[in-house]
């Protein structure tokens, strides 16, 4: 069973010669804008395994010399694959950590003595508890020390690092604001280990660990920039498209305290290891025509023309030969003969992505339409990772499919229970208890006792405590009710609303279980029952919480199993990926764009507002301060504006989709 198919999605084929040059000359040409040596790997596993091998080699070399190997290690998601490979090498290849010294790069402050959400605990769970390292060789900042002793404590931490001869290897991730460890924007090049106040972006990111922004510590004790740069070798890791923007700033941008990771440009032995998704904003991947000759394909041509339009401020049909020649695109003139020929091709390509019939227009020529006309009506399944992603990401299209008489099913893949605030539980329990009393059912003590029990639990609940199973159930019921209300508003019969409650999600914690066969079978059974002609899935692979990717992997795994068995329904089914909750499709990748009128946009907003528990007080709004309906409208209007600027029809808003073809 293949459970990581989303990681193999490439929106456009990147020629291997852009990221795996054949010789030193080619590499120097491709990377001439990059100021830190950067290696791009086809997968996270490939990159992580390479870094793990480099670390293992250093450990073994130090062992032979009878010396310690000093590692500075972070927590977080980026190094987790490296740690997994090191554990495998320890268990299967005899890699010993007896000569390894580990310094934890940072710790949240303040923490209570029994805090379970510390960075050090994460580091132990991911690596230290699984290898034979001497516990006396592990050092970490103390998140519980008194404030008046922190300055001296940090000075001694630096001394301890130096007492072992300095750091041999520093392993880094890169934060959303370009931070390394918790060196936030504004950190100085000569900074050492210190207490630092976390900015809102870092606290929002850390809130995934602590549950809510209110529970997240306001500061951190972190290794300084100069401490990290003092390492003999530095590896910066980044995986996934949500890291792409910061990688470009770090690798190609100027050295600046606004992007602390850019300080790595001053190190003579720093290396950046990224996967293809994280490389997408680097010039050699995103705009290869600026550094080399290109292997042109339709999507790369479209990307180049959109870029040229934005650079010149012109719509597609007004671009001239001069525009192409002056901006590194003369190869296209040689291929097509003139700007006019290129312009017409790309204009028509984009024009053909626009359709007001997302399920296909019956009795019409579908040669140049993104969806086929037959069969009509279609059976449609919209997979929604959380109980509101359907309306946030494709509420306009969903409503259009219903109005055009297709059989629309919505499958809510997870309960979304941990994203409901405690005050929502109290509010609903007030109602249930009051209802019980008003309608002469007060002698039934079950409700009143459960009401008192839940009130007591929530009152005594401490930061980091897990909700009881009863409270998680109530939170799940709240979200089910909201989803049903939104579905009814969109005229979807409730017998076509499916709550899958995939088991991987039901941990009661932010950290979820890995996807399992049970998750895939639930999805597969639904597909077998409905036999859809269209499937819509979440394409928000940069979702900061990871649930969207796992849910999409469950659908893709189920489809893959059906494909292996030769399921007949799959031969007449198309799969479309939507975005909207966390990002939007780039225009060069869009294959279907559904226009939304002002009235339809208002209806979409109303659908989103049915999910009242996900408004201002929702625990997981991410780093974007806008509410979900605001983000959605801004992105939909932004897509329509871009089409307008390129010289195509002007609409109020547009929802965009990319087709997924089973591998």
From Swiss-Prot:
Disulfide bonds: none annotated. GO terms for molecular function: glucosamine-6-phosphate deaminase activity. Residues 1-290 are annotated as: Glucosamine-6-phosphate deaminase-like. InterPro entries: Glc/Gal-6P_isomerase, GlcN6P_deaminase-like, GlcNAc_PI_deacetylase-related, Glucosamine6P_isomerase, Glucosamine6P_isomerase_CS, LmbE-like_dom_sf, NagB/RpiA_transferase-like. It holds the Pfam family Glucosamine_iso. The active site is at residue 184. It comes from the Bacteria. One of its GO terms (biological process) is carbohydrate metabolic process. In the N-terminal section; belongs to the glucosamine/galactosamine-6-phosphate isomerase family. NagB subfamily. NCBIfam families: PRK02122.1. This is Putative glucosamine-6-phosphate deaminase-like protein BT_0258. The lineage of its organism: Bacteria, Pseudomonadati, Bacteroidota, Bacteroidia, Bacteroidales.
């Amino acid at each position: 069973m293949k459970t990581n198919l989303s990681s193999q999605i490439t929106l456009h084929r990147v020629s291997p010669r852009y990221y795996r040059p054949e010789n030193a000359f080619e590499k120097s040409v491709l990377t001439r804008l990059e100021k830190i040596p950067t290696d791009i790997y086809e997968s996270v596993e490939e990159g992580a395994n390479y870094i793990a091998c480099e670390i293992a080699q250093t450990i073994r070399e130090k062992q032979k010399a009878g010396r310690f190997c000093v590692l500075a290690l972070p927590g977080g998601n980026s190094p987790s694959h490296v740690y997994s490979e090191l554990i495998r090498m320890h268990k299967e290849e005899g890699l010993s950590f007896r000569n390894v010294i580990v310094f934890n790069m940072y710790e949240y402050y303040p923490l209570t003595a029994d805090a379970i959400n510390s960075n050090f605990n994460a580091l132990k769970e991911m690596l230290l508890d699984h290898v034979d390292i001497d516990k006396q060789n592990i050092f970490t900042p103390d998140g519980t020390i008194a404030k008046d002793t922190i300055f001296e404590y940090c000075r001694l931490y630096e001394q301890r690092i130096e007492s072992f001869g300095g750091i041999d290897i520093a392993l880094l991730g890169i934060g959303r604001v370009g931070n390394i460890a918790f060196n936030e924007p504004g950190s100085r090049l000569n900074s050492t280990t210190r207490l630092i106040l976390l900015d809102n972006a870092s606290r929002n990111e850390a809130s995934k660990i602590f549950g809510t922004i209110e529970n997240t510590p306001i500061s951190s004790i972190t290794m300084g920039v100069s401490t990290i740069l003092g390492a003999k070798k530095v590896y910066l890791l980044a995986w996934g498209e949500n890291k792409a923007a910061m990688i470009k700033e770090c690798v190609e941008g100027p050295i600046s305290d606004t992007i602390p990771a850019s300080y790595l440009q001053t190190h003579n032995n720093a290396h950046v290891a990224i996967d293809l998704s994280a490389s997408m904003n680097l010039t050699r991947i995103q705009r290869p025509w600026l550094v080399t000759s290109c292997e042109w394909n339709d999507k790369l041509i479209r990307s180049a023309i959109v870029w040229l339009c934005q650079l010149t401020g012109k719509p597609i049909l007004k671009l001239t030969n001069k525009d192409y020649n002056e901006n590194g695109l003369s190869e296209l003139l040689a291929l097509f003969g003139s700007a006019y020929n290129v312009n017409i091709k790309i204009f028509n390509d984009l024009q053909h992505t626009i359709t007001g019939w997302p399920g296909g227009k019956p009795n019409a020529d579908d040669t140049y339409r993104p969806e086929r006309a037959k069969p009509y009506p279609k059976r449609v399944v919209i997979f929604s990772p959380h109980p509101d992603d359907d309306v946030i990401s494709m509420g306009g299209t969903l409503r259009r499919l219903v109005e055009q008489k297709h059989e629309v099913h919505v499958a809510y893949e997870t309960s979304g229970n941990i994203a409901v605030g405690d005050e929502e539980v109290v509010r609903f329990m007030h109602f249930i208890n009051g209802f019980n009393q008003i309608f002469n059912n007060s002698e039934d003590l079950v409700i009143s006792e459960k009401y008192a029990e839940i009130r007591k639990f929530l009152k005594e609940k401490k930061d980091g405590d897990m909700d009881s199973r009863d409270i998680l159930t109530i939170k799940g019921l709240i979200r089910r009710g909201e989803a049903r209300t939104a579905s009814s508003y969109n005229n979807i019969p409730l017998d076509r609303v499916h709550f899958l409650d995939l088991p991987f999600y039901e941990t009661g914690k932010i950290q979820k279980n890995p996807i399992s066969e049970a998750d895939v079978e639930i999805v597969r059974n639904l597909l077998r029952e409905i036999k859809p002609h269209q499937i819509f899935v979440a394409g928000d692979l940069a979702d900061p919480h990871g649930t969207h990717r796992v849910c999409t992997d469950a659908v893709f795994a189920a489809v893959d199993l059906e494909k292996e068995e030769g399921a007949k329904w799959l031969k007449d089914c198309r799969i479309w990926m939507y975005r909207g909750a966390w990002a939007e499709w780039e225009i060069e990748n869009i294959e279907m764009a559904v226009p939304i009128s002002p009235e339809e946009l208002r209806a979409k907003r109303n659908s989103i507002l049915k999910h009242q528990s996900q408004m201002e007080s929702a625990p997981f709004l991410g780093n974007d301060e806008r509410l979900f309906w605001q983000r959605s409208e801004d992105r939909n209007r932004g897509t329509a504006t871009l089409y307008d600027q390129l010289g195509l029809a002007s609409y109020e808003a547009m929802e965009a989709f990319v087709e997924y073809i089973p591998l």
